Regions:
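Conserved catalytic loops of ABC-family nucleotide-binding domains
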Residues: 84-95
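A short, proline-enriched helix->beta-strand linker immediately N-terminal to the Walker B motif
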Residues: 55-59, 88
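C-terminal portion of ABC ATPase nucleotide-binding domains
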Residues: 7, 15, 23-28, 80, ...
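Catalytic Walker B motif of ABC-type/P-loop ATPase nucleotide-binding domains
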Residues: 61-64
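ABC-fold ATPase nucleotide-binding domain signature/coupling loops
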Residues: 19-48, 66, 70-73, 141-153
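Conserved D-loop/post-Walker B switch-helix segment of ABC ATPase nucleotide-binding domains
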Residues: 71-81
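ABC ATPase nucleotide-binding domain "signature" region
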Residues: 41-42, 48-53, 77, 93
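ABC-type ATPase nucleotide-binding domains, specifically the catalytic core motifs of the NBD
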Residues: 1-6
Length: 153
């Protein structure tokens, strides 16, 4: 494996919101994770994977449904901290939850493998029927109203 300093790994764990559960383990950063991660929860496994990616400081990050097992608060905090760390990198997020990609610079909407929309959240709410349907099924009326007025939901 790569040589990642303890400080870089701890910073990555902080960003990935993994520090609390790592610190709760007897061996902390030296704890063994079973094959397939069966001794950690789905959300913990995702946060460990995200921390490993962050610690490597790549120029391109690809998160493929990496936030799906996280609760809303953890997802929001993690993405906020992640955006600070990845300001000079390209970040590609594959997601099914609109809340995960709400503030992305550009969102591609796929329907049956074809791109049916491209733009910001606000642009897609105004122009893409598929995105509108997804947004209405996932976001509350208050979130839709707040976002449509340029607020942060």
């Amino acid at each position: 494996g790569e040589n990642i300093s303890d400080a870089d790994m701890q910073q990555a764990a902080d960003i990935a919101q993994a520090t609390e559960f790592i610190d709760s383990k007897v061996d902390r950063y030296n704890s063994l994770i079973s094959q397939g991660g069966t001794n950690v929860s789905g959300g913990q496994k995702q946060r460990l994977s995200i921390a490993r990616a962050i610690a490597k400081h790549p120029k391109i990050y690809l998160f493929d449904d990496s936030f799906s097992a996280l609760d809303y608060k953890t997802d929001l905090t993690l993405r906020k901290e992640l955006s600070k760390q990845t300001a000079d990198a390209t970040v590609i997020i594959v997601a099914q939850r609109i809340s995960t990609i709400l503030h992305a610079d550009n969102i591609l909407v796929l329907d049956e493998g074809k791109i049916v929309g491209s733009g910001t959240h606000e642009e897609l709410l105004a122009s893409c029927e598929t995105y509108q349907e997804i947004a209405k099924s996932q976001l509350s009326e208050a979130e839709l109203a707040g976002v449509e007025k340029g607020g942060r939901a």
